[in-house]
Every structure is written in C-alpha cells, then in structure tokens.
C-alpha cells in the first residue's frame, strides 16, 4: 500500500472516529419513573405530552415548541391550546398519536394500557413514564424531562427556584397550629390528600396541619363524618368547580359547625396550580400562604 493510500486511510479513520464519538456523546439515556430505560440518539425535538403537569414542566424548561400533541386535559399555558389534541387514558388512539410523528410520548403510569404502549414502541416511538405524588418526585420528574430534552441546567434552575420559594415561605410562617382540609372531589365520592402527597407538604411549608396527614396514602377516599369530626379551620377545594364549589360546600348539609364553614375560610384552586404536580407548586404554596395568613397578592412572600 502506498504512503498516499495509508495517509488517506488514517484520515478517514480519524473522521469516522470523531463522528462516532460525537454521536455517542449526544445519545440520551434516561430511566423513567416506572424503572424503564429509554435511549434516544439525541435530545427529543418532537413530543406528545399526555398529562398537564408534564406539559407545564416542558414549558418551564423552555421546550414548548417541541410539543406536537397534547392530552385533552392539557390546557396550561394558554398558548398550548393551539397544539393538536389527542385522546388520553383508556380512549387513547395510537394512530392519532402516530400521525403527529413524535419521537417520544410522555405519559402517566395510570393513563395508558400496556397494549397501547407496545403499539407505540413497535412503531418506533419512545414511551417515557412520569408519575408523581410528593414534591421530591416532582423534582425527579423535572430532572427526567430535562435530561430527555437536553435541558439539564434549565431543569435544575426550575427546581432551585421552587426550593427557594418554599424556604422563603417557611421562614415567614408564624407557627400556626390550625388545620386544613383538601377536597379533591365532592360527595358522594370524597377524596383528599394524605401524608405522602405534595398537598400535605404544601400545608407543612405554610405552617399548618393537614387533617388527614395521619394517613399514609397520598390520595384516599373518606367520609363526610370524618371531615366533620376533624373540624378543619381551612378548606381548600381542588374540585375544578369554580365558585359553584365554594357555594356548595358553604351550604353543605351537616357541615355548618365546621370552623372553616362558620368563618367562611374556603379557598378555591381556580387556576389548578394545586391540582398539578408541576413547577407551579411554587405558586400554589404562595396562594396557600396568602390565604392562611390573609395577605394580599401583591405582598407575596416570594417572587
């Protein structure tokens, strides 16, 4: 082999090695919150997001433009309403999702069946599961999605912002000893938050006690009698019923002797920030603090 041929071979080998190293360096490997390892050749640029909280995380780290489809309950921020809707949960239409040509579908562990996941993966779509119940798991979801999108630094900045707000609120609480009840759904199927939920943590951050904080489950079904017996000083509605929900609970039969009802200390989560385990939990903590300590919005304890 001539010297020219050897030199050409070495140059080509170096180019190939550099290209291979570049490709290897851009590969994304994540372990989702269901313990499944997912590998992408590069950060995702086309994604269908099935649940509201994950959409809010994507937008918070600057990836809204990568969202090509959304579940029917995904509605924040308002600009996301222009993105095509796909059915979620048991009604998920795989063909509808595939038509949007996503690289990744981001979903909740309870939302889609194994068969639907299998169909998506057989068609080359990566499925990443995000599932949250407490604040630490929200941080995990933010880091997961940040890595998936090649936005690790942005994800850490969002987490730091949340932590800073929580710490500032904790420093301002006055050792309040009163109790709060979170109503997630109204009668006849009353659901509330237990000790392993982020709502319980929001109460702790604000220096108050969740009346069902002695229950280990994150979410649990309860009876009206239990609420009446535990006599909360504050009630927070996460029922998505607007002002009608407040009016209903204030006039609910048998609840008239509850402190929160007598003093009309009922707060409605009308912007859904308490309902969603997303970066807006920061806003939820501010709203709860302002409600409990009767502070006007412009006097927020954190930016």
How does the language model describe each region?
Residues 45-100, 104-110, 208-211:
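A short, structured surface patch at a secondary-structure boundary
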Residues 73-79, 111-144:
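Flexible loop/hinge segments that line or gate small-molecule binding clefts
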Residues 94-102, 222-231:
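Short helices/loops that flank or line small-molecule/ion binding pockets
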Residues 46, 92, 137-140, 144-147, ...:
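Structured C-terminal subdomain patch of bacterial secreted/periplasmic proteins
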Residues 33-35, 84-95, 215-224:
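Short helix-initiation/N-cap motifs at beta->coil->alpha
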Residues 4-5, 10, 19-53, 152-181, ...:
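Bacterial Sec-exported substrate-binding components of ABC uptake systems
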Residues 115, 130-144, 177-198:
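Extracytoplasmic ligand-binding site segments that recognize negatively charged/polar headgroups
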Residues 71, 196-219, 267-268:
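His/Asp/Glu-enriched short active-site or ligand-binding loop at hydrolase and phosphoryl-transfer sites
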């Amino acid at each position: 082999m001539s010297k020219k041929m050897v030199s050409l071979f070495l140059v080509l080998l170096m180019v190939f090695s550099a290209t291979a190293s570049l490709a290897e360096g851009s590969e994304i490997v994540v372990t989702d919150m269901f313990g499944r390892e997912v590998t992408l050749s590069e950060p995702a640029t086309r994604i269908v997001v099935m649940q509201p909280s994950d959409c809010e995380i994507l937008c918070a780290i600057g990836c809204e433009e990568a969202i090509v489809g959304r579940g029917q309950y995904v509605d924040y921020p308002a600009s996301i309403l222009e993105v095509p809707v796909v059915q979620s949960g048991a009604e998920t239409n795989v063909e509808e999702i595939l038509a949007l040509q996503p690289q990744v579908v981001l979903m909740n562990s309870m939302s889609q069946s194994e068969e639907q996941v299998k169909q998506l993966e057989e068609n080359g779509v990566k499925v990443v599961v995000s599932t949250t119940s407490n604040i630490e798991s929200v941080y995990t979801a933010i880091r997961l999605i940040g890595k998936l999108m090649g936005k690790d630094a942005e994800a850490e900045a969002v987490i730091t912002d949340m932590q800073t707000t929580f710490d500032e609120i904790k420093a301002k609480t006055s050792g309040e000893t009163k109790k709060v009840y979170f109503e997630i759904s109204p009668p006849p199927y009353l659901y509330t938050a237990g000790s392993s939920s982020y709502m319980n943590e929001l109460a702790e951050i604000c220096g108050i006690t969740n009346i069902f904080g002695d229950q280990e489950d994150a979410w649990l079904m309860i009876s009206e009698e239990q609420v009446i017996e535990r006599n909360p000083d504050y009630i927070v509605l996460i029922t998505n019923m607007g002002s009608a929900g407040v009016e209903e609970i204030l006039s609910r039969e048998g609840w008239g002797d509850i402190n929160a009802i007598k003093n009309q200390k009922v707060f409605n989560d009308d912007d859904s920030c308490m309902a969603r385990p997303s970066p807006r939990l920061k806003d939820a903590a501010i709203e709860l603090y302002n409600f409990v300590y009767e502070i006007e919005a412009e006097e927020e304890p954190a930016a």
